[in-house]
């Protein structure tokens, strides 16, 4: 890897940890808060320096548009030939009716053309977030969560799951006897799901986030 200054290495490591933990990179404001910068502009300067050194790629106009480059053991990231010139057409899922598939036509309100560099892996759809249970993970009411369809997930990943008739976004942790779905907001309770529960179904994992107004 290109030699980085101590501060640049801190920023790079923070981005990498955020992607490993949540599936998407931090915002400039989150980097500034975590590393004690005076403002998000200071974080932006370090990001531009990292981009010039070829270790990250920045997507213009997106607060989480950061992608790691040239890191052999980095989390898998979506790459395409000429990715900057290509667009993904992603369906936006709004409210989901009980008992029907998330990607049923009646749940899709529209499609968005998105730059693939915004995401850590190729997503299958965008889910409009409702509520603040994941606030401390930087996921706010009205955000669009990029989701990759999966039937399995690792501990610590942010997932989309069905619980009975509801669809929820939580952090997954395995516990003796089942799974714990962890809220990233102390005002909300965690949810324990017993092993083999027929009410639980994993719908996918978070691979990116688009703040309302960024598209």
Curated annotation (Swiss-Prot):
CDD domains: S24_LexA-like. Keywords: Autocatalytic cleavage, DNA damage, DNA repair, DNA replication, DNA-binding, Hydrolase, Repressor, SOS response, Transcription, Transcription regulation. Its EC number is 3.4.21.88. Coiled coil: none annotated. InterPro entries: LexA, LexA-like, LexA/Signal_pep-like_sf, LexA_DNA-bd_dom, LexA_repressor, Peptidase_S24_LexA, Peptidase_S24_S26A/B/C, WH-like_DNA-bd_sf. The record marks 98-99 as: Cleavage. It holds the Pfam family Peptidase_S24. The active site is at residues 133, 170. Residues 28-48 bind DNA. SUPFAM superfamilies: LexA/Signal peptidase, Winged helix' DNA-binding domain. It comes from the Bacteria. GO terms for molecular function: DNA binding; serine-type endopeptidase activity. It is an enzyme of class 3 (hydrolase). One of its GO terms (biological process) is DNA repair. Homodimer. Belongs to the peptidase S24 family. NCBIfam families: lexA. This is LexA repressor. It comes from Burkholderia cenocepacia (strain ATCC BAA-245 / DSM 16553 / LMG 16656 / NCTC 13227 / J2315 / CF5610) (Burkholderia cepacia (strain J2315)).
């Amino acid at each position: 890897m290109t030699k980085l200054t101590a501060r640049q290495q801190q920023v790079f490591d923070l981005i990498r940890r955020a992607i490993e933990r949540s599936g998407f990179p931090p915002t400039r404001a989150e980097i500034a808060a975590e590393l004690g910068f005076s403002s998000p502009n200071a974080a932006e300067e370090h990001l531009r320096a990292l981009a010039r050194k070829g270790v990250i790629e920045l997507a213009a106009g997106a607060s989480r548009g950061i992608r790691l480059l040239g890191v052999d053991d980095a989390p898998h990231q979506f790459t395409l030939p000429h990715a900057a010139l290509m667009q993904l057409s992603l369906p936006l899922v709004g409210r989901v009716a009980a008992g029907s598939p998330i990607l049923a036509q009646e749940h899709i309100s529209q499609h968005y053309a998105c730059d693939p560099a915004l995401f850590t892996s190729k997503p299958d759809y965008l889910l409009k977030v409702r509520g603040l249970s994941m606030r401390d993970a930087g996921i706010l009411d009205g955000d669009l969560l990029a989701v990759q369809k999966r039937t399995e997930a690792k501990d610590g990943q942010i997932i989309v799951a069905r619980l009975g008739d509801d669809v929820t976004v939580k952090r997954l942790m395995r516990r003796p006897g089942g799974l714990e779905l962890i809220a990233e907001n102390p005002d909300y309770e965690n949810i324990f799901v017993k092993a083999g529960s027929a009410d639980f179904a994993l719908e996918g994992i978070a691979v990116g986030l688009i703040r309302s107004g960024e598209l």
